[in-house]
């Protein structure tokens, strides 16, 4: 992963890493303690990469978490992404090696400037940022995965790359 990776390739690779990073995480849902059921997190792509359709890039089940892949250079786009989901919390996956803390600080400073002292607006945007994930976290999480998970990442990259490039998908089975 690099900052100069083509946008579609970065989205495919980041999806594959995140899908495999989260897939073994368990959560519990139920209407009472006695009805709790264990479920594993699942990440889904919501459409084609770089479709410019205004959609969210990935959605996590069963928690309903939204992920948007973007670049660090245009904070107006982040605010538009937040607006399009009505300020629902969103995780930004950013093609940068800048630390996520620095990106978050810059984004929050940009929000503060744009809010012109209006606390309600500032808080709505600040509260809509669930998490910042950069190339640094993606690399770190890849290094923590098992060999089987790395193989799964490579298979996912191959499948989604072929899909994006309108190539035939080869089935290894």
Please place each PLM-identified region on the residue numbering:
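Catalytic core segments in nucleotide and nucleic-acid processing enzymes
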Residues: 22-173
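Interdomain/boundary linker segments immediately adjacent to catalytic/signaling cores
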Residues: 1-26
């Amino acid at each position: 992963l690099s900052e100069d990776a083509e946008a579609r390739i970065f989205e495919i690779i980041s999806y594959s890493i995140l899908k495999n990073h989260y897939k073994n995480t368990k959560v519990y849902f139920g209407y009472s303690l006695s009805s709790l059921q264990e479920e594993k997190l699942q990440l889904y792509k919501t459409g084609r990469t770089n479709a410019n359709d205004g959609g969210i890039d990935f959605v996590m089940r069963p928690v309903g978490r939204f992920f948007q892949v973007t670049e660090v250079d245009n904070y107006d786009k982040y605010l538009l992404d937040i607006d399009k989901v009505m300020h629902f919390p969103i995780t930004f996956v950013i093609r940068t090696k800048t630390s996520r803390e620095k990106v978050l600080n810059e984004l929050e400073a940009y929000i503060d400037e744009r809010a012109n002292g209006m606390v309600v607006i500032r808080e709505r945007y600040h509260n809509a940022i669930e998490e910042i994930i950069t190339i640094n976290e993606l690399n770190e999480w890849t290094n923590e995965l098992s060999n089987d998970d790395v193989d799964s990442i490579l298979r996912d990259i191959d499948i989604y790359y072929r899909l994006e490039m309108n190539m035939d998908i080869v089935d290894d089975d």
